[in-house]
């Protein structure tokens, strides 16, 4: 048993020793392989490091070469720029040298001129001294010979010169006044003609009677009433004469006051429509008619101010303005006349650069006094000035009202324009009844003269008789004949008619060729 154990121990020891040596040899073999591998790795690392070192050296050399090249190029550029600057500085220096030389020459020349001027000044002063001495000697000699002092001689010469010049100045002033007057006349005519052509105003002939139509003649008896009480009541309340004659189905109202006449017409119309006609009903209808007329007057005033473009009038003044519709002057409606004057004055003011709206306002109100001149003492000019002052109108408007008939001196251009527009509107052919017949006769005579020639188809007198247009037959009158016809008609007008201004004769020859495509 013991031997077995010993044998086992010996085997174990021997196995351990053998295992130790085996492991040692294996470890040494591994260590040797590792060393060889490490040496190989070290060698490869050395080779890689050498390659990197060479590559880095090459890159460094390339960078150094590149930097050197750039530096050399930069140095060359700087040298070139410095050379250019040096050249420019040298050029400037040369220019400065030349300028300095020129300035030196100029300074020398100026010094020479100054010296010459000083010498000339001294010479002039010497000459002036000699001249003064000679003048004094001559004055003394002249005073001795003429027996006049210097002041007396001056006065004598000035008087002679003044006499000679005064005549020349007077002639020049007269010529200037003549030219100015001619130019002013031309300008005034141009402005007036333009204003007249641009102003288109309608006109209605006014009469002193109104006619009320009746449904039948039996109504006349009802209007007269028992023992004439109805007609007397109506005449008493309105102040209008009722004329009931043989005129069928009509009653004539006659009166000088258009407002009363209009009141009577409205009242009578209402009575006829109502059918109940007796004094109490008449009084009621007359009251209604008066209120309607008052309202109509106010509306007319407002419409007129709107039409003319005048704003800001006092309400009472607007109502007074509306009353002008029922006033006439030589048959011309005063409200229409005032509107026409307003537009004419405004047009002329615009041409002259004046306030057009203020001129319209003054023209519209210039005859405002005529609305109540039959109710208040004084002329329509005085009443108009009082009204305009009362309602605080513009001073130019007040002066225009006061001066439009020459009673007061105009203080503004607008006042003069209003007076001119008033004269134009009143004198316009056809505006007032006293000139209407002559005006129509002259227009008819113009057309009669034109149509008396063979080949004339139709003639028209237009522009208030300032032009006649003749339409001729083209198959009878050629172009040359048209000129001859115009001259012949012009001669006959000059020989046979009396007219203001001039008349334009226009011959119109028209040929038409018409075809129809089917």
UniProtKB/Swiss-Prot annotation:
It is a single-pass membrane protein. It is found in: Cell membrane. CDD domains: HDc, KH-I_RNaseY. The chain crosses the membrane at residues 2-22. Pfam families: HD, KH_1, RNase_Y_N. It is an enzyme of class 3 (hydrolase). Belongs to the RNase Y family. HAMAP family: RNase_Y. This is Ribonuclease Y. It comes from Geobacillus thermodenitrificans (strain NG80-2). The gene is rny.
């Amino acid at each position: 048993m013991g031997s077995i154990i010993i044998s086992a121990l010996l085997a174990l020891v021997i196995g351990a020793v053998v295992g130790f040596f085996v492991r040692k040899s294996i470890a040494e073999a591994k260590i040797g392989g590792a060393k060889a591998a490490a040496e190989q790795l070290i060698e490869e690392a050395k080779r890689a490091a050498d390659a990197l070192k060479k590559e880095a050296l090459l890159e460094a050399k390339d960078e150094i070469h590149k930097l050197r090249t750039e530096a050399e190029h930069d140095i060359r550029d700087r040298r070139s720029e410095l050379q250019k600057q040096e050249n420019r500085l040298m050029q400037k220096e040369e220019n400065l040298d030349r300028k300095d030389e020129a300035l030196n020459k100029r300074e020398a020349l100026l010094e020479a001129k100054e010296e010459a001027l000083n010498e000339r000044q001294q010479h002039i002063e010497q000459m002036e001294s000699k001249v003064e001495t000679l003048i004094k000697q001559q004055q003394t000699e002249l005073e001795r010979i003429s027996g006049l002092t210097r002041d007396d001689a001056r006065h004598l010469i000035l008087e002679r010169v003044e006499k000679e010049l005064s005549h020349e100045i007077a002639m020049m002033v007269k010529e200037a006044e003549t030219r100015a007057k001619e130019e002013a006349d031309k300008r005034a005519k141009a402005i007036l003609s333009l204003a007249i052509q641009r102003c288109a105003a309608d006109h209605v002939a006014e009469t002193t009677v109104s006619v009320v139509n009746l449904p039948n003649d039996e109504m006349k008896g009802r209007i007269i009433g028992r023992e004439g009480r109805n007609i007397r009541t109506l005449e008493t309340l309105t102040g209008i004469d009722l004329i009931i004659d043989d005129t069928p189905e009509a009653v004539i109202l006659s009166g000088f006051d258009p407002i009363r006449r209009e009141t009577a017409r409205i009242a009578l119309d209402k009575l006829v429509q109502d059918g109940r006609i007796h004094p109490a009903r008449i009084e009621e209808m007359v009251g209604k008619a008066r209120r309607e007329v008052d309202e109509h007057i106010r509306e007319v005033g407002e419409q007129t101010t709107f039409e003319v473009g005048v704003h800001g009038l006092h309400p009472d003044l607007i109502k007074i303005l509306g009353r002008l519709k029922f006033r006439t002057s030589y048959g011309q409606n005063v409200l229409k006349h005032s509107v026409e004057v307003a537009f004419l004055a405004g047009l002329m003011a615009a041409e002259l650069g004046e306030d057009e709206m203020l001129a319209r306002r003054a023209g519209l109100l210039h005859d405002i006094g005529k609305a109540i001149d039959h109710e208040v003492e004084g002329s329509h000019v005085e009443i108009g000035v009082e009204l305009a002052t009362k309602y605080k109108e513009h001073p130019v408007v007040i002066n225009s009202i006061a001066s439009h008939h020459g009673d007061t001196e105009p203080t503004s251009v607008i006042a003069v324009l209003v007076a001119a527009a008033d004269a134009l509107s009143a004198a316009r052919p056809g505006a007032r009844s006293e000139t209407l017949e002559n005006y129509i006769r002259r227009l008819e005579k113009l057309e009669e003269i034109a149509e008396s020639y063979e080949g004339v188809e139709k003639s028209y007198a237009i522009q208030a008789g300032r032009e006649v247009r003749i339409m001729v037959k083209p198959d009878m009158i050629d172009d040359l004949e048209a000129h001859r016809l115009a001259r012949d008609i012009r001669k006959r007008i000059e020989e046979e008619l009396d007219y203001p201004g001039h008349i334009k004769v226009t011959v119109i020859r028209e040929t038409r060729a018409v075809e129809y495509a089917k």
